[in-house]
Amino acid sequence: MTTPVWLTGFEYGVATPTTNGGGLFNTITGSPSIQSATKNSGSYALRLNPSSAIYTVFKNLASPTIVVGRLYFRFASWSGVDNELVYVPVAAGVNLAIKINATTKKLFARFWSTSSGSDHATTLALNTWYRLDFRFDVSTGTSKIDFQVDGVAATQFTLAQSATTVSSIAIGPSNSDTMDLFIDDVVVSVTTGDYPIGAGGTEALLPASDGTHNAGTNVMEDNAGTDIGSTSAYNKINSIPPSSTTYIRQAAVGTGNYAEVLFGDISATHSAIIGAMGILAYTSATTTSNQGATIMSKDSFSSQTDIWGNPTTRADMSDGSTSNLYYKSALLADVVDDTTVNALKARVGYSNDVSPNPYWIDLVVEVAYVITTGISATVNQVTETDTAQAITKRKIKAVAQVTETD
């Protein structure tokens, strides 16, 4: 069973990726976008379409020595130079990457500024989704790169360098380029045995009904000041993309008060669950410090995952005022099958400082799932530019992060 540390299909739909709060990305280079016209599964995918520029997104990792991942990629126009799809920056030594050969249209492994592996057997075509599985291993004195394209393995490529650690994963090129590249269905693990992760997709689950509140009177309210309980909570925090038009706020101190929402069930055709990531969009009335908490559970809060703060150790939600949204995310503990996915709930509130009021803008759970090879992902894998050849070759979506160039 895959043990992810980060996953995304970009299903939160934030059109302009942001580092606000660190919940989505930690570093962004250039102006990538998240769009809905071309995707592998679900409703959204990342687009990297620089014009003589570098567009890359980075997600920090907790200094692992092995990074395993899967992503889906699709070129709408070719890279003009040899450039990365995904790479990992290391604490010492040279970075490890998987790049496209701009001449042959094939992928190859690369140790930055040092050496390149042979081209993969697969010649890529435009407007076609491919699955990239990869493993970067810097745990010993021999660094190793393994990868597959649609299940066809490349020869392992190695380099003698001291054991080190990885700081992040980067998706996108490190060199200035003009191209159009789509990325979807990213899963990242730090467990060597998870390679290859294989075919899959991503679905967004949103709050679909109210649970059992302890909202108090004039404590947990909607954006209009109506008490939660007198009005529904779930439909105030279930927008994609996130919107501050509606939200839940805590208007008075109440460390035991909260609003509870239940997420909808997974509907995508799948054979297993890889994992789930809870995402919070939040802000505050002003930027003066305050408190709040967001927790999620798959067993009615016998256990919980802290998305941001918890009922006893609340977190500051005052990063920005209502003109800006901020994001936190966490991998949901022990969400591993349909039973746990379909039981997901969230609670928001618990504040001991409501000056200014904390605002819960939106909640979403991204669920990564397994599909049987040869079965299409659930939704909308066809776009206006697809050809019959592209459709027959289609599969489903994976990821990577650094600041130097190669």
What are these language model-derived features?
Residues 1-24, 184-228:
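Extracellular carbohydrate-recognition regions
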Residues 69-73, 262-264, 268-286, 346, ...:
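A short beta-strand element within beta-rich, extracytoplasmic domains
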Residues 127-138, 145-147:
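Short tryptophan-centered beta-strand motifs in secreted/extracellular beta-sheet-rich domains
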Residues 157-182:
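Flexible glycan-contacting loops in extracellular carbohydrate-active proteins
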Residues 205, 209-222, 227-232, 245, ...:
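Intrinsically disordered, compositionally biased repeat/linker segments
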